[in-house]
Every structure is written in structure tokens, then in C-alpha cells.
């Protein structure tokens, strides 16, 4: 399978995690390609039983497609663990490197890498690393945006976008840190948080990319 086709599969999976309907237009926007290019790739993937079309939800991954996506995430996240723990990469440096390597390393290499790393369960961003042959199921999946209730929350996972990671680095926010939600303003869509005795005003868009666990 080509790296381009693998990227399309991951894109469809990620869109499905964010919005209820996966359209040609949304795929084109995220892949930064033309709608006709998406249409052509969609036809190929449908012929290979990687995706199917649903009237309500748009394009969906088949079990074959989901198996391939899960393996891509497994490779990607194991590589990220290796880069951080053995090559001293920072969390905002690893995503792009892993994006390249995930398409080139062999299954044998990944199995040896996983064993060497001690079979980690999560990547440096808190994302689940599925076992070989298993579907990806995120264990840390409660967005901060859905926790409007005041209280203390444990940061368990973050999206691996460069801008978000630089924002978190600026405020020294790391996986495993405690975030105290003071209030949520419905008008401005702003969360007021306390982190390490510092008050932070966090937008709803950022809160959607932070995953937490209620502590009290």
C-alpha cells in the first residue's frame, strides 16, 4: 500500500473522531488536495474494500481499513516513544518524524521495537498504542471541552498538533499534570484553569484537544 493511501485512511479515521459525517469536501480540506483527487482515491479504496459509503455518516472504514489504520497508529506511536526515550526528542518534534518513518519500517522492525521498549501502552502524547492485530481504542477519551463542571482533572492525552504542543510547552503543561477547572464562560467559550498556581484562560477549541480524567 502506498504512503498516500495510508494517509487517506488515517485522515478518514481522524475526521470520524471529530465530526459525525465524513465528506469528500472535508477529506480534501484536511489532505490539502483537490476534490477530484479525493474522488479518484475514494474509488480505489472502495474497490479494495477499505472504505464504504453510508448515507448518514458519509465514508466509513471497513474492518480491513480499520485494521490497517490501527497498525499505522501502532507504528507511529511506538516510533514516538523511541524518539523521546532514546534519542532525546521533545514531544513537539516527534510527530513529523514518526509520520515519515511509519510508512517505511517493516512489521518485523516494529515488533522488535515494541519488545525493546517494554510494550508501552501509550505514546508521549497519551494516545493508546494498540497491540498487534487489535483495533485502536483510545483509553483516554474524555475531552476537557465536555467537562464544564468545576473540579480537578488529570491531563491524560493531547492532540499532537505542533501549535498545541508549543502552547503546552510555553505553559509547562505535561501529561500527568493536574488542571483545576475554575469555571466555563458560556458566552466567550473560555475555560478558566489553574495549573501550578498559574491562571490560564483556555479556549473551547484548545479544550477539545485536551483529554482528562476527573480526580474529585
Where do the PLM segments sit?
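Key DNA-contact positions within bacterial/archaeal DNA-binding proteins
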Residues: 36, 92
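Short, hydrophobic-biased segments on the C-terminal half of alpha helices
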Residues: 42-43
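A short, conserved structural fragment
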Residues: 46-54
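Basic, amphipathic "hinge/linker" alpha-helix immediately C-terminal to the N-terminal HTH DNA-binding motif
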Residues: 57-76
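Mid-protein regulatory/catalytic core that forms ligand/cofactor-binding pockets
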Residues: 102-209
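A short alpha-helical element within helix-turn-helix/winged-helix DNA-binding domains
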Residues: 26-29
Amino acid at each position: 500500500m502506498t504512503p498516500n493511501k495510508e494517509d487517506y485512511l488515517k485522515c478518514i479515521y481522524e475526521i470520524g473522531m471529530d465530526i459525525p459525517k465524513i465528506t469528500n469536501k472535508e477529506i480534501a480540506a484536511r489532505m490539502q488536495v483537490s476534490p477530484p483527487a479525493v474522488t479518484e482515491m475514494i474509488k480505489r479504496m472502495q474497490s479494495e474494500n477499505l472504505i464504504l459509503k453510508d448515507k448518514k455518516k458519509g465514508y466509513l472504514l471497513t474492518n480491513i481499513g480499520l485494521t490497517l489504520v490501527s497498525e499505522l497508529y501502532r507504528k507511529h506511536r511506538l516510533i514516538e516513544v523511541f524518539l523521546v526515550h532514546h534519542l532525546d526528542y521533545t514531544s513537539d518534534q516527534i510527530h513529523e518524524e514518526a509520520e515519515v518513518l511509519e510508512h517505511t519500517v517493516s512489521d518485523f522492525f516494529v515488533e522488535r521495537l515494541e519488545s525493546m521498549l517494554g510494550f508501552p501502552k501509550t505514546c508521549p502524547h497519551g494516545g493508546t498504542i494498540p497491540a498487534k492485530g487489535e483495533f485502536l481504542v483510545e483509553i483516554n477519551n474524555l475531552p476537557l471541552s465536555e467537562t464544564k463542571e468545576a473540579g480537578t482533572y488529570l491531563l491524560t492525552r493531547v492532540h499532537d498538533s505542533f501549535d498545541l504542543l508549543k502552547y503546552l510547552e510555553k505553559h509547562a503543561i505535561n501529561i500527568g499534570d493536574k488542571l483545576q477547572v475554575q469555571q466555563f464562560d458560556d458566552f466567550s467559550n473560555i475555560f478558566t484553569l489553574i495549573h501550578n498556581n498559574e491562571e490560564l484562560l483556555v479556549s473551547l477549541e484548545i479544550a477539545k484537544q485536551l483529554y482528562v480524567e476527573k480526580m474529585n
